[in-house]
């Protein structure tokens, strides 16, 4: 099996919501978030339906009683919704639905939303095909942290970032610090950049792409403490 695992974006909240025996992580009807895959970059999609598209429940919703979901029924429709133009990270599909997670890059705090959306309400956003160096350089913000990209030595870019995630009694932190050269539309590096990304060595694995005005960052949840991930869309602040 390829290296793939669910990020800490939303799964922890699910496990705290009810008895562990009621939750089946392998139930294909459960939307658990997005996965890291060594072989495949994260895909961003945009909501094209509207003006509102409501999330659809998983069986673990409503205190694990939404057993008939996901389905296109009033009982399976969540109160929360997205609007036309919102960008989401996508996970698996189940029938006519796609599992998505959403975090506004403009928010001041980390509030991830997740659930099923009708696949017909989404369209893929293609990454910038050949970003220039100037397209990467800058300070990029995401709720909870930021990443700085600057010119480095030997045609590489120097990348530094920090992330803070609130916990029950304290907070957890993560750090990125490496040098990497863009290849086509992607920056990919492991730990400090000294390990080739193609190898399965190292702990902190990171990929970056330019998607619209945003910097898409994804990691394997190995770049910090428990529940810490840099995964998300970042906006350039300077």
What is each residue range found by the language model?
Residues 129-147, 230-238:
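Tryptophan-anchored aromatic micro-motifs
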């Amino acid at each position: 099996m390829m290296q793939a695992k669910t990020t800490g974006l939303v799964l922890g909240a699910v496990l705290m919501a009810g008895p562990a025996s009621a939750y089946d992580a392998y139930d294909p009807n459960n939307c658990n978030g997005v996965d890291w895959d060594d072989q495949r970059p994260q895909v961003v999609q945009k909501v094209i339906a509207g003006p509102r598209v409501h999330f659809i429940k998983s069986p673990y919703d409503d205190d694990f009683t939404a057993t008939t979901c996901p389905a296109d029924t009033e009982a399976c429709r969540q109160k929360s919704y997205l609007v036309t133009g919102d960008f989401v990270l996508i996970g698996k599909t189940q029938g006519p639905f796609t599992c998505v997670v959403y975090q506004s890059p403009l928010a001041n705090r980390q509030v991830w939303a997740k659930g099923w959306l009708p696949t017909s309400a989404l369209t893929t956003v293609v990454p910038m095909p050949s970003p220039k160096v100037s397209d990467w350089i800058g300070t990029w913000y995401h709720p909870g942290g930021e990443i700085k990209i600057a010119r480095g030595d030997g045609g590489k870019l120097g990348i530094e970032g920090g992330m803070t995630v609130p916990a029950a009694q304290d907070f957890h932190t993560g750090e990125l610090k490496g040098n990497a050269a863009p290849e086509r539309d992607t920056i990919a590096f492991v730990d400090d950049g000294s390990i080739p990304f193609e190898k399965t060595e190292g702990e902190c694995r990171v990929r970056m792409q330019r998607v619209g005005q945003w910097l898409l960052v994804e990691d394997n949840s190995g770049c910090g403490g428990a529940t810490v991930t840099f995964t998300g869309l970042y906006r350039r602040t300077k």
